Amino acid sequence: MKPMTSSALRGFCRDRRGASAIEFALLAPLMLGLYIGCVEISEGIAADRKVTLTAGALANLSAQATTISIADMQNILAASTAIMSPYTGTTAAKVSCLKINADSVAKVTWGVASTGVTPRAEGDVVTIPVNLAVPNSSLIFSEVSYQYIPVTGFIPSFSRISNTGITLSDVMYMSPRITPPVYDTKACS
């Protein structure tokens, strides 16, 4: 191999033919990372919004009824799957009726949950916001949680989040529309 002459070295430094390829090689990983990050953030926000909509729908559908049969409640809980679409993971949903006593303590009078989820037990005390603790009243209380697993599970730096996912959850309180609903002979009063 011949030693490089000073004129050859100057010519090499002035040559700009590969500059675009080098710039692309440096910027492409950054641009790809930004794109994947934007997609993941928007997907996560959309999934969280679906969780909030599901909690609201469960409480709203339960608060509208005066009596709720077991079949009606199964349909209400099944609606959570439809609302969460296109997210196909397991949605854990609970609906409870809370009776608030004269001391503003909210206790569960009946509770149901989606398949594989333990409902709140009758008599459980539930902490509710102070402005909702109206003595001698009732509330419908829904809880929804969803395990969101990011699409970028194949990227090693995200493996800690990607393997376990992120738990998205929300709760909703609604006042019964007409009277506190009776669920399968269990009154909410």
Question: How would you describe each model-predicted region?
Answer:
Residues 56, 60-189:
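Short, conserved structural patches
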Residues 1-83:
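Alpha-helical assembly-interface signal, strongest on the long, hydrophobic N-terminal helix that forms
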